């Protein structure tokens, strides 16, 4: 998008361009925050898994617990629960993990729905801009016996620019929303799989 087009959008797009711009800034900040939050190293560290497995195999549970406290990832908090309840049956451990896992996934998903809502809001704001522009056009038509085409340009520009800008923000926002949801679902599955491996390792 070149500078002249960007200037045209903000000078001719009308009032509704600005709420869409605010939505785009909010959406981008939420996406970037979530993107870095769910980076794999902050959820499951492969090095941590290797070290934990070595300590479990050697029955060095105190050192394994110390590793959990120092790792500070979601997975390490789940492993800590497993280790603290290692003398209990596997079903009890899995039930406890499920509750804790749901809390962690909820925290990861928090504010994701805002992205989906912002996508819809931008589309609707674009539509409002279209309606506002067309109202301007009809006002001009109703006040002139002979319509001068250039006098309609302002309303038409407002309608087209607002619609285009609304979609320009809404589409990537929705893609980001779906991407984050997909990543969080994959993380949830991986956390379950890795947790079961740790339980089996302790019980066998």
Locate the predicted segments by residue.
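Hydrophobic membrane-targeting segments
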Residues: 1-47
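Alpha-helical transmembrane segments of integral membrane proteins
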Residues: 17-30, 119-126, 169-173
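Alpha-helical transmembrane segments of multi-pass membrane proteins
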Residues: 32-37, 170-183
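Predominantly long cytosolic amphipathic alpha-helical stalk/bundle segments
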Residues: 43-128, 132-146, 176-204
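Glycine-rich helix-loop "coupling/hinge" segments at transmembrane-helix boundaries
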Residues: 140-150, 154-158
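Hydrophobic alpha-helical transmembrane segments of polytopic membrane proteins
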Residues: 158-175
């Amino acid at each position: 998008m070149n500078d002249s087009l960007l200037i045209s959008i903000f000078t001719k797009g009308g009032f509704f361009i600005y709420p869409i711009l605010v939505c785009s800034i909010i959406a981008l900040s939420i996406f970037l925050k979530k993107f870095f939050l769910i980076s794999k190293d902050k959820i499951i560290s492969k090095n941590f898994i290797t070290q934990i497995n070595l300590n479990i195999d050697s029955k060095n549970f105190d050192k394994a617990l110390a590793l959990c406290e120092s790792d500070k990832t979601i997975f390490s908090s789940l492993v800590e629960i497993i280790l603290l309840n290692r003398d209990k049956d596997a079903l009890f451990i899995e039930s406890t993990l499920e509750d804790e896992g749901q809390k962690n996934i909820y925290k990861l998903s928090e504010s994701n729905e805002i992205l989906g809502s912002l996508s819809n809001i931008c589309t609707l704001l674009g539509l409002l801009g279209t309606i506002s522009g067309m109202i301007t056009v009809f006002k001009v038509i109703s006040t002139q016996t002979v319509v001068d085409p250039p006098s309609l340009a302002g309303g038409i520009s407002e309608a087209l620019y607002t619609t285009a800008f609304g979609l320009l923000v809404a589409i990537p926002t929705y893609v980001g929303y779906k991407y984050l949801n997909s990543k969080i679902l994959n993380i949830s599955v991986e956390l379950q799989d890795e947790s079961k491996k740790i339980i089996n390792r302790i019980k066998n």
